[in-house]
Amino acid sequence: MADRAMTRVHSVRERLTDTLSAHKNELLALFSRFVKQGQGMLQPHQLLTEYEAVIPAADREKLKDGVFEDVLKAAQEAIVIPPWVALAIRPRPGVWEYVRVNVSELAVEELTVPEYLQFKEELVDGSGQSNFTLELDFEPFNASFPRPSLSKSIGNGVQFLNRHLSSKLFHDKESMYPLLNFLKEHHYNGTSMMLNDRIQTLGALQASLRRADEYVLSLPLDTPYSDFGHRFQELGLEKGWGDNAKRVHENLHLLLDLLEAPDPCTLENFLGTIPMVFNVVILSPHGYFAQANVLGYPDTGGQVVYILDQVRAMESEMLLRIKQQGLDITPRILIVTRLLPDAVGTTCGQRLEKVLGTEHTHILRVPFRTEHGILRKWISRFEVWPYLETYAEDVANEVAGELQATPDLIIGNYSDGNLVASLMAHKLGVTQCTIAHALEKTKYPNSDLYWKKFEKQYHFSCQFTADLIAMNHADFIITSTFQEIAGSKDTVGQYESHTGFTLPGLYRVVHGIDVFDPKFNIVSPGADMSIYFPYTEAEKRLTALHPEIEELLYSSAESTEYKFGLKDKTKPIIFSMARLDRVKNMTGLVELYAKNDRLKELVNLVVVCGDHAKASKDLEEQAELKKMYSLIEEYKLDGHIRWISAQMNRVRNGELYRYIADSKGVFVQPAFYEAFGLTVVESMTCGLPTFATCHGGPAEIIVHGVSGYHIDPYHGDKAAELLVDFFEKSKKDQTHWDAISNGGLKRIYEKYTWKIYSERLLTLAGVYGFWKYVSNLDRRETKRYLEMFYALKYRNLAKSVPLAVDGEAAVNGKICTLGC
């Protein structure tokens, strides 16, 4: 059994003991207050509220000289089981310590991770005692693996990895042979690239590179590679160095410099020039994945938009690189999703669909099936688990048939796509990239501790297990923001929340993931700039759409597309667009607007969510629909609000953002948590001032007061006042609105474009593919551990999820596991 503290054993215990000795009465009063409330869990805001209520201001000033206030502010939760109070303390992102205070004796003890989790389990099972509880611990497999120690290094994994491994691998001539072997074995569909068999030693490589460089320097810079390729073959060099003499010279020099004086930047630049990625498979099984008429359907939103924009940018970058590398290879990208025979007016029943705006990218749809048949209908993303093992095998077969080759990179999306990506990458030995989009454990508070309460509706035991498998199996993980990995000073990151947690009665995660792991890289997406562009670019504006946009916003009649109306069309508009579910918190926006009379005087509210034309099958959406109607009726919002059904037309949505900007309105994103916030980027790219949740990605996208504003959805009254203040200032001074609009645009151009994204992603794929080849980066030991965890734990959990009822005869097929 594991028996370790996560970091810095004793330090907090010693400091707390000293503080208790110096301020016994004050702290006894506080901890007694905690215990008096009885058994339970206290959140950070509750701890600070009690601290301010119990300790007088003068005494709090005295305590500031010690460490207690810092410890309390760093506490992410307190578990109270009288007479004990246990604290989970997070001094900085990614670093955790655990202590327990006996209030009766004022004694402090340090807890190991298993001890803390076992104590926490007593909130559920009453005793926390078990003869044996499975503990999941990945730390021993990574103990000898390098990782940074500074929080600022989190999310910059490839830079750290290059620094460390370049110094390790290139410390002498002999250690460079893995690079030589990598270049010699590099090929595509049996055709050699970079080097041929004429070069067998490093000395021969350097000599050939120098002779080749002398030769190309004698040629005009624009001489095509085809004119001198035969000469290069004689020197032991094959295609892949460049398309003309100038580029070949640059790339030859990169490798010569690397062999002479290795450094991480030169290494990354050189690896970025090697042709490595030609076939990409992107997995996104759940929901309705199509190019039209699906946005707003259950489980269908930002992830679909993200992937469609992603593949267009990736294909462009792949084509550019292949051309610059002097190759005649056609790249392929396959977006693999679920085929839905009951396609309900979409193309989701079509096996193969070309992606518009691309030449070589397709959506490949593969159905869910069991021995009872093919599943015809849509099912929630929370119910997909029993289908994924068979699905992974079916997808592998379909992909092999389509590509006639093994993919070079597999990218998973969300929990289901990442699990299927893990199964496929494990079987094929392919580089795997994980993109979470959202990890559900952080969206539903205490859904780990009280997982049994959520199990019937959400099956979180399967999902959390799948997430742990995927994040530990991946070669690299990309996130849109730092917060997604490690949160902020005050909030825990999505991945960080998987460091240590418990599913009582199932297993304890002693060490689930390390946010300092160099597999983490921040690669932020952008908006499609052919659709989303500033409202000031008059020559590009789609004015032909204005009549239907005006009808959408202001028509006095109601329809299946919009309900309620706006009396005063001259007011600016608060605009929001999202799925209608609890986390997106659209009803929270309506409520904060409804409760602020001054805000209602200043502006109208337009929300785009849900579907008035059909009854929802989604339980959360049903509850939010009911709440929305109730708020509109209670606060008599008709005349102030326009409620529009989910809009499928992205082109019109882009012009809708700009039309709202014409009214000098704003965009509000009120989610309780948002992993990234594509709509935030879209609105800012259109020049629309944006107010967005402070919980998650938008807190990084927006610089508060410069390129937009942060709002706290848990404090709707303060968010409403912030909006009132903005509109009142803008009413008095037009330049105030303009300043935020321009600040948002500047921020986008600096950090959030698909061009930057695609360049970075393909470079990462090459770098991690190289390191996987030349080092132990494939983490074989971890993957064997994962095979056992998958077979003994995940598989049984998946079987416990009820199958949907419908189908037709299916063809028998082999079942794939992590060990196959």
From Swiss-Prot:
EC number: 2.4.1.13
Region entry GT-B glycosyltransferase, spans: 276-753
Keywords: Glycosyltransferase, Transferase
SUPFAM superfamilies: UDP-Glycosyltransferase/glycogen phosphorylase
Reaction(s) the record says it catalyses: an NDP-alpha-D-glucose + D-fructose = a ribonucleoside 5'-diphosphate + sucrose + H(+)
UniProt-listed GO biological process terms: sucrose metabolic process
GO terms assigned for molecular function: sucrose synthase activity
InterPro entries assigned: Glyco_trans_1, Sucrose_synth_GT-B1, Sucrose_synthase_pln/cyn, SUS_EPBD, SUS_N
Chain's role: Sucrose-cleaving enzyme that provides UDP-glucose and fructose for various metabolic pathways.
PANTHER family xref list: PTHR45839, SUCROSE SYNTHASE 1 (PTHR45839:SF29)
Family membership noted in the UniProt record: Belongs to the glycosyltransferase 1 family. Plant sucrose synthase subfamily.
Entry-linked NCBIfam families: sucr_synth (TIGR02470)
The protein, known as: Sucrose synthase 2
